[in-house]
Amino acid sequence: MKTKEFHFNLPYSLIAQYPSEKRGSSRLMVLDPKLQKIYHENSVNNILKYINSDTFIVFNNSKVRKSRMYAESEMGSNVEFLILDRIGTDLFTALISKSKKQIVGNVYKFPEGLMGKILSKNSSEIVLKFNDDVREDYFEKHGFVPIPPYIKRDYDKIDEDRYQTIYSKYVGSAASATAGLHFSRDLFSAFEKNNIEYDFITLHVGLGTFLPVRSKKVEEHNMHFETFLIKDCVANRLENAKFLGKKVLSIGTTTLRALESSYDNKLKKFKTGQQSTNLFIYPGKNYCFKFVDMLFTNFHTPQSTLLMLVSAFAGKDFVFSSYEEGINKGYKFFSYGDAMLVLNHI
């Protein structure tokens, strides 16, 4: 399948540059792939019209690290880093600006005199070794929220709150699991009032989620691994919900990939503990969804693995028709944009 089949044209005015006025106030497009119907809601809070006590919701509670860092090269120029994965107390994978000019052995001066050296480098990332242990509070103090490059404005303090979900707990993501940004405390209270169960897994968002597909053919894309955690107690609740016939609603593509990666459909059991996945789901792969029944997600960038996953879940033609309708109706796209609820998969 050709990657360009997942391209679409989007007016720049529909790329959300700021979050909605308050969580839950974004618009919601609802897709029913089986009936080929599209519904429109003026608020994400109206998700309650489509779920009930027979639904079990799963969220990704990874927390976004302030992973955008700035340092000075030995030549005195400013260099930008995006810290990806922690692989040791002083060792991280990262992206680096002007990558072609940066070579193994280069040393950079970070805030407070911390020094970082490129240990190794490949086509997509570097391994960065610091001269001292780096705790998370260092990034909290000196780093910046890694808002995506299509948000073309100056850094704003509002991002420190709104680019993070209200339930984020475990630091490790280099980008937000943006589907969760829509959920407010009031909405969680409504879930509880309506006896709608929910729980959390943890997948740290990295290159596997946000690296675009650059190969001409979808099948040739190299999907990067991302680490995730499913606790025993969470797995037990999920398995029991499925046994009772409840519909599992995944909040976001990251949650879906974690659940689908670790569920054994024959044993009807999850593998628990810390794991990693490079699961790449796209139309034409004939992937059979094992555990997730419903998907809540955002409107994604062209030619992204996220758009491909949603297309496999709901049907490519139907998804692209819904995107076209969304554009015509002025829906906002990408991280701070409006939301989509897919009621079932094909």
From Swiss-Prot:
A GO cellular component entry from the record: cytoplasm
Superkingdom of origin: Bacteria
Enzyme class, first EC level, given as a word: transferase
Keyword Transferase appears in the UniProt entry: yes
Key words, A-Z: Cytoplasm, Queuosine biosynthesis, S-adenosyl-L-methionine, Transferase
Catalyzed chemical reaction(s): 7-aminomethyl-7-carbaguanosine(34) in tRNA + S-adenosyl-L-methionine = epoxyqueuosine(34) in tRNA + adenine + L-methionine + 2 H(+)
GO MF: S-adenosylmethionine:tRNA ribosyltransferase-isomerase activity
Keyword Hydrolase among record annotations: no
Pathway(s) this gene product operates in, as recorded in its UniProt entry: tRNA modification; tRNA-queuosine biosynthesis
Principal location class: cytoplasm
Location in the cell: Cytoplasm
Record Pfam families: Queuosine_synth
EC number: 2.4.99.17
InterPro entries: QueA, QueA_dom1, QueA_dom2, QueA_sf
Gene Ontology terms describing biological process: queuosine biosynthetic process; tRNA wobble guanine modification
Protein family: Belongs to the QueA family.
Assembly description: Monomer.
Its job: Transfers and isomerizes the ribose moiety from AdoMet to the 7-aminomethyl group of 7-deazaguanine (preQ1-tRNA) to give epoxyqueuosine (oQ-tRNA).
NCBIfam families assigned to the protein according to its UniProt record, in alphabetical order: PRK00147.1 (NF001140), queA (TIGR00113)
Listed name of the protein: S-adenosylmethionine:tRNA ribosyltransferase-isomerase
Source organism of this protein record: Borreliella afzelii (strain PKo)
